[in-house]
Amino acid sequence: MADAKIAKLQSAVAELNQISENEKSGFISLVSRYLSGEAEQIEWSKIQTPTDEVVVPYDTLSPPPEDLEATKKLLDKLAVLKLNGGLGTTMGCTGPKSVIEVRNGFTFLDLIVIQIESLNKKYGCNVPLLLMNSFNTHDDTQKIVEKYANSNIEIHTFNQSQYPRLVMEDFQPLPSKGHAGKDGWYPPGHGDVFPSLMNSGKLDALLSQGKEYVFIANSDNLGAIVDIKILNHLINNQNEYCMEVTPKTLADVKGGTLISYEGRVQLLEIAQVPDAHVNEFKSIEKFKIFNTNNLWVNLKAIKRLVEADALKMEIIPNPKEVDGVKVLQLETAAGAAIRFFDHAIGINVPRSRFLPVKATSDLLLVQSDLYMLVDGFVIRNKARTNPSNPSIELGPEFKKVANFLSRFKSIPSIVELDSLKVSGDVWFGEGVVLKGNVSIAAKSGVKLEISDGAVLENKVINGPEDI
């Protein structure tokens, strides 16, 4: 049955002239793997907590060389790759998410460029920046990178694969059914970074320049900066793959974790966990760390494994609906590739290396006095004594960046804030200070204005009379 489905799908895909032969064969092989049901269930009893040899505490890494020349040699072996396929739609923005303004008028991409530029300048090295775009972000990104033409940085862009969405009903590609637009296609997750790096020719180009490692991270993680200590450790220990993990907080209970399984280190995602063990997976006691998606990978190893077609990561089925048609997109994650590499490790890094901006509540954190901007680096304010960030919940009125910005005359001071919950039609004046636990809920149809200079400490506000 599966064979007949694949044969039928293959002939339909062969007709799709929008994509390359590599993309066609990659897609067919992904669907074949999915249909053969080779997603093995994890045997819960075989899971072991990784030792410090496998997940190395950051503090135990030996210090990097101090002289500039030795550091330059290390950095000349590195390329930085940012995953740039996502759109800013969830935050109400058009175009690539990486061009949302984060702070002081700088976008994610601006900050990334400034950081690498200052590294290249300081050490006289040439760390190139690669942006992996999707067909959703490619055209915009090409225009945007032109503004860095005079920067001291080589920028390369390439596209990740473009696969057709599958119609659930008959397992045929959506574009074959008259869906000519972008919604007939999807980018198959960031696990696709490895074949795309190879197919684009970028991998061989990097190897010919003497590069040995690529540091891969989400473009919206402001904490994912080049770390010489980590690079030095990987080169000295010949680790082909390193995943940065960090201690879980209650906000991260769904994040993937590293386990030792049948003698290899591997990523365990919540989707792979048998129902009976989901609560155990979420517990901070047993699974103490989670994947930041900051990954350091050896380029020769990527080439070897892609050529051998050995990177068979767990498939993540992602059902969607397009114009009332139920479709399926099959995806893979880059972190799941860890088990195919030799001497793969995790490094348990400080939380500061994980500062993602997924929603406007995160934007509030990074635009506030909780952080400072120094040479393109977003650095936490030392005046904050609590190691964890305040928890922030903003209502739907704040969901889009434009609405969020218009509702704050200036971003409040939150250095001493523990939690903030805002719902309804709330507007903040200039120079507001929030401390402790603050909850502000405007009743339906009521506009609630927090006046300039207001100091709210451990307050529950349901109407103007409570301010």
Curated annotation (Swiss-Prot):
Sample GO molecular function, one term: UTP:glucose-1-phosphate uridylyltransferase activity
Top-level taxonomic group: Eukaryota
Its EC number(s): 2.7.7.9
InterPro entries linked to this entry: Nucleotide-diphossugar_trans, UDPGP_fam, UDPGP_trans
Binding positions (substrate): 85-86, 190, 218-220
Gene Ontology annotations of biological process type: UDP-alpha-D-glucose metabolic process
One GO term describing the cellular component: cytoplasm
Reported function: Plays a central role as a glucosyl donor in cellular metabolic pathways.
Family: Belongs to the UDPGP type 1 family.
Protein name according to UniProt: UTP--glucose-1-phosphate uridylyltransferase
Native organism: Musa acuminata (Banana)
Upper lineage: Eukaryota, Viridiplantae, Streptophyta, Embryophyta, Tracheophyta
Underlying gene: UGPA
